[in-house]
């Protein structure tokens, strides 16, 4: 799920071969509300056929983190060199490298 256009989402999926890891895609155009409303995250969980307790959101923006918090979905805030002035206080964990999201490191949260 991304608030980006489906064209952008498809480009990223194709470039990185992500299709095999996801059961569907949702873009901002598919929604009535935008972040920080949790609609996009709840729809993604529903599309995946998963209970929100089994889901994790990786977000790099204040609005995305707030949306995850409002949806009661575990949120890993991704802090990069390109994200500035974001509020990570509502995230469950803050990471600066995707290696920090390995199953062995985050399984204690589920």
Model-identified regions with their sequence ranges:
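Conserved phosphate-coupling serine/threonine residues in phosphotransfer and NTP-handling enzymes
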Residues: 2-4
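Asp-based, Mg2+/Mn2+-dependent phosphohydrolase catalytic module
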Residues: 6, 10-110
């Amino acid at each position: 799920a991304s608030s980006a256009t489906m064209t952008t989402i498809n480009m990223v999926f194709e470039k990185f071969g992500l299709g095999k890891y996801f059961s569907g895609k949702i873009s901002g155009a598919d929604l009535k509300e935008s972040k920080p409303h949790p609609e996009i995250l709840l729809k993604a969980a529903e599309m995946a056929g998963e209970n929100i307790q089994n889901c994790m959101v990786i977000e790099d923006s204040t609005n995305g983190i707030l949306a995850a918090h409002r949806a009661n979905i575990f949120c890993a805030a991704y802090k990069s060199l390109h994200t500035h002035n974001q509020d990570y206080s509502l995230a469950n964990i803050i990471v600066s490298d995707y290696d920090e999201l390995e199953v062995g490191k985050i399984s204690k949260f589920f």
